[in-house]
Amino acid sequence: MPYLNREQILILIKNKQIYSDQKSIIHQIQPASLDLTLSHKCYRIKASFIPNNTKISKVIKELSLTEIDLSKKNLLEKNCIYLCELNERLKLPNDIMGKSNPKSTTGRLDIFTRVITENGKEYDFVNYNYKGKLYLEIIPQSFTIIVKKNLSLNQIRFFKGSDKNQKINQVNISVSIKKNQITAYKAKKITSAIDLNKINFYKANKYWEEIIPKENYFIIEKNEFYILKSKELIKIKNNQAAELEPFKDSFGNFRVHYAGFFDPGFGNNKSGTPAVLELRAYDTPFIIRDGQLVGQLNYYEIDEIKNKTYGIKINSNYFNQNLKLAKQFK
């Protein structure tokens, strides 16, 4: 099966193929993924990079502007680049690889993140037989954020064998825009920082502007960040996981959805749940209309999960979402 489920990830942990600086990481296991957490080591760096054949420790010496100790809370300023070492280490077997993506909250806060590995030639992919540390590049784009050691911004999924590209179904995803209704939120230009450990704490109207269009469309402004929702209701069975793959630029002049993974059980509490879409325009304003295609949801089969699927039982934050901002807002 392409995705390893919770029980199969637990086996990797018991076999010391996933291990951590922390005493236990069992609580970090999701239905078909593992939360990755920040260590205390973090650096503000001059530029993004891909290691290729250069040791990351050498790159840090070349690019580091300052070292930040995350054993206590620290500011990560918007539009600056940071590299944080993660707590987790891997000793993957030769038939298992990993792929990382931002968690839902990370995407909704417009925090651009990418996992980097030693000798890595692309972001977010962990090769078969990889043995070593993991690092996370962090670029807050709309808000300055406050973070601390053990915070999770990303998650990793694991694939077995060569089945990672086997899709069992795919569905086009479009955007929902309704006139005279709150149809989107736009991030405000604000200097106040957001402490990511504070849940249901911040007033949304201080950080977000409600978009209420007069027609079933509106213009997204260049270099602005928006939260919208899909027209389609998504329902992921207990023996499935899904990933939202953004369409190519030929479908629109924007980037959509930073956090594109859906766990088994998502939307199973009712007839389905809309996907929340994170959208940022490129270099020009762009009109977006109700029903406009933005991506494709690819379904993959996994071994069925009998319990601890996505939802209220495992304290999932967005199990009953509609057009929902990050969990830090009330």
What is the role of each PLM region?
Residues 1-330:
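DUTPase catalytic domain/fold
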